Amino acid sequence: MSLSKTTLLLYPLCFFMLTNSYAAEAVIEEAPYTLMNVLANKGLHDFKDERWNAYGQLTYIENWKSGFPAAYTNFNDTPNSLLSHSENGFTGTATFYFGLKTWQGGELYVVPEIISEKPLSGLKGLGGIIQNFELQKNGTSTPILYRSRFFFKQTIDLGGNSIHLDSAPMQLDSTVNSKRLVFRIGNFSILDFFDQNSFASNLRRQFNNMAFMTHAAYDFAADARGYTDGGVVEYYDDDWTVRFAHIVAPKNPNQLRLDFRMFKYFGDQIELEHRHVLYQQAGAVRLLAYRNRENMGSWTDALAAFQADPNQNATTCTGFNYDSTNASAPDLCWARKANIKMGFGVNVEQQLADDIGVFFRGMYSDGKTEVYSYTSTDSSISLGSLVKGTRWDRNKDTVGIGYAQNWISKQHAAYLNAGGVDGFIGDGKINQKAEKAVELFYSLNVIGAVWLTADYQHLMNPAFNGDRGPVDVYAVKTHIEF
């Protein structure tokens, strides 16, 4: 599908979503069908004095990619291009959330997870617009069981109004003060607590593209599945929250093994959040900054090492590398040392009516060093809107539209143009352009806590390369909560 045809399709939907903004009547939804609600209805579980809880989810996503035009693919034996022929892939996940109250304000959570996946093109060829967010889990077609989270949480009330927190995955039903300290220590995803957004975070019931899960340029320290170890502290003061985390970095970029020398190599982040009501509609603004110290190579140093000695190329490295067979290209393995990476971002969400919400994210990272844990992006924006189905008597349905655009630094582009690769991209050369993605989805509530989503994505300039694409990706997603 051409961009012009895609644009013609977007106009009517945008008009419907953003101009049909009268306030819908409030809808009272029945309690979701979960194990906890079933037990509570039988008198076997007490939400008012919840000592434990258990939840789960199943998600299966099937992707189809069309063939697309490309001036070249894997030029000069550089291996990281998105393949230009049609492909299909899938992901399947099962997650089980267990919570236990230890004492007043103390809670313990453990979350085992199963992943099975087959990525398009071996998960190569897309920078910050990877079409399926579950692909960060680093699985194989054979299901793999692992522990995703195991952490302790302590809440210290400091006064103010009482706030009720409903029972949910990784949250025991409880009442807390509006002024409070919250400490967490253990194994978790930093995205469990940072850069949350009501309309673009919980992608199992929203978008599919990884650009909408968080800032594409947020290179948060984590293993290849997106998890880490460390500590998080939050201070809540009514409508304000400030949170800080010090977390462990991976031993090698985008790999599973973590480096527990957490005061030598680490990721720090701080976020300031303000929640507000604007014209009787809820919203929030979040400012995020991160600073990583990791054993990573800079684009400039890798190029300089190759230019000084062509034997220091992509095929001769004995350290960690991405298996490039391009002997005329530089490689980051010759430049790895302790380096600093920093980034700053803004995250905004706003309800326009009871059933319409919009969001925006934007982040700038310095772009001097290699991607270590997330996507091959140095700066990014994303925006979009969700509309609930109350307007057409489908209260649990959702329709969404999103747009994302990502950039890389000049140093990053120069390295790629010399034939270098990073964890996800490298076509052998590059006609540097911004990556862009448009995504449309309709999430249909089939019954109870079962959703079926049809999803379409139009991806432009894959791997920041104007010589390749555009690419159309179609998906069907089945999601069950229990």
What spans do the regions from the language model cover?
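N-terminal regions that are enriched for targeting/export leaders
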Residues: 26-101, 111-113, 119, 125, ...
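Surface-exposed coil loops of outer-membrane beta-barrel proteins
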Residues: 125-142, 161-271, 420-425, 430
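Transmembrane beta-barrel strands of outer-membrane/channel proteins
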Residues: 54, 58-62, 110-114, 183-187, ...
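Outer-membrane beta-barrel "beta-signal"
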Residues: 26-29, 148-161, 401, 470-482
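Residues that define the transmembrane beta-barrel architecture of outer-membrane proteins
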Residues: 50, 88-94, 143-148, 225-229, ...
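Residues on the lipid-exposed face of transmembrane beta-strands in outer-membrane beta-barrel proteins
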Residues: 56, 94-100, 150-154, 185, ...
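Short loop/turn motifs that connect adjacent beta-strands in outer-membrane beta-barrel proteins
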Residues: 39-54, 65-67, 99-108, 121, ...
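Outer membrane beta-barrel transmembrane domains
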Residues: 271-273, 288-338, 359, 366, ...
